[in-house]
């Protein structure tokens, strides 16, 4: 791809060789002469003088203090987001030749495929599934009966989607994830045993959601477990039955969310946090890493601590704990004075 075409794609202006052929994307520290990179963080400006990249995307304000005539430059207002556009383009190019349905696919009755669908070897479909235009489904994935998957989705190898689940458009699901497995519902009997509660609901995943590898999203006991539009889930996250995660919320790895909890819009939840069931978290909440959320959160803000509290309170508690040894020393000194 010529540099002038890249500039057109990201709406930038070229300083240097318009005809330079770019074959890939690299880091500023290690990019080669046929690769393009970018600088958006001032910490990386020092690498401009030493990089071997053929071209660099820079902000309009970036001041080139040394003469590097061997490097071509594309000027843009926002190098970071321009680079994201370029990454998306190159990623799509890698998959542009993927099309068609393998002969080694098991298709149930009345399964409907949209246009330009790609299905790899050994994918299994149950009856009455519907797959939208341009969706790509990779090897060894199982999609049970009555599932609907929208357009432009990517479902990577070894994903399992249980019956009756609904997945929107432009959803990405990474390997090993299970969607629609039974919720953890058991009724304790008088004799101390447990009787399984049938999980009759479904999972609904709205548009533009990305789900990392080895996540588990349980079906509802009744109704729906819902992952709303724009949610991003990291790897190894447990979402229990009847949970609702609001739009554009992001959740880091190894978070567990117990049943029937409702999380608001635009929340950010740190890794290894645990959230109890049957509570509500309002919009615009930030939860730190490894936090135990044991009650509803009604006000936006940052919350931290093993026993969750507003961040300022948590800091005060930490300071008090650190001061305990000093207090002990003062108490001993006072005791010694009194005993004298």
Language-model features: locations:
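Terminal amphipathic alpha-helical/low-complexity segments used for targeting or macromolecular assembly
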Residues: 1-104, 170, 176-177, 182-196, ...
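Structural signal for interior beta-strand "rungs" in well-ordered beta-sheet cores
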Residues: 38, 100-310
